[in-house]
UniProtKB/Swiss-Prot annotation:
Alphabetical list of SUPFAM superfamilies matching this protein: Nucleotidylyl transferase
Principal location class: cytoplasm
Protein name: Phosphopantetheine adenylyltransferase
Domain of life, source organism: Bacteria
Localization of this protein: Cytoplasm
The protein's Enzyme Commission number: 2.7.7.3
Keywords for this protein: ATP-binding, Coenzyme A biosynthesis, Cytoplasm, Magnesium, Nucleotide-binding, Nucleotidyltransferase, Transferase
Species per Swiss-Prot/TrEMBL record: Streptococcus pneumoniae (strain ATCC 700669 / Spain 23F-1)
Biological processes, Gene Ontology terms: coenzyme A biosynthetic process
Protein function: Reversibly transfers an adenylyl group from ATP to 4'-phosphopantetheine, yielding dephospho-CoA (dPCoA) and pyrophosphate.
Record site: Transition state stabilizer: H19
Gene3D superfamilies: HUPs
Positions contributing to substrate binding: S11, K43, V76, R90
């Protein structure tokens, strides 16, 4: 029997504790879970991709079946096929997230009908945490330690030094 392989994607700019919770939960559903950091052309970059990847790898190092990958110019479905993933994992905080994700699910299914999408609902303590909210707090010099993993906080501090 073949391994169950999933792909959880996002821009993770920056990764939040909500993302980490989703990754931890999704890792229990699969033999192998890839976490794909994708460039989002609709969002202005905050942290360079290398910093995001390094911080995310440190944040998930306790999960033996999780591997972090990145992509600049590929469709999620194509990356899933290349990695052997048969399931895309998406996180939902609210109805707006579902509506946003449903359109991608439609196209993904049209491009590859053998790749399914599953949705994990945010835990109540993470419902209102978002990367854009964290970026806004940082813009005004606020402490974000309770919203992001320590490794991400380190990457942000290191990036500010440069």
């Amino acid at each position: 029997m073949s391994d169950k392989i999933g792909l959880f994607t996002g821009s993770f700019d920056p990764m939040t504790n909500g993302h980490l919770d989703m990754i931890e939960r999704a890792s229990r559903l699969f033999d192998k879970l890839y976490v794909g950091i994708f460039f989002n052309p609709h969002k202005q970059g905050f942290l360079p991709l290398e910093n995001r990847k390094r911080g995310l790898e440190k944040a998930v190092k306790h999960l033996g079946n999780v591997k972090v990958v990145s992509s600049h110019d590929e469709l999620v479905v194509d990356v899933a096929k290349r990695l052997g993933a048969t399931c895309l994992v998406r996180g939902l905080r609210n109805a707006s997230d579902l509506q946003y994700e449903a359109s991608f699910d439609y196209y993904n299914h049209q491009l590859s009908s053998d790749i399914e999408t599953i949705y994990l609902h945010s835990r109540p303590e993470h419902l209102y945490i978002s990367s854009s909210g964290v970026r806004e707090l940082l813009k005004f010099g606020q402490d974000i330690a309770c919203y992001v993993p320590e490794s991400i906080l380190e990457e942000i501090r290191n990036e500010k030094k440069d």
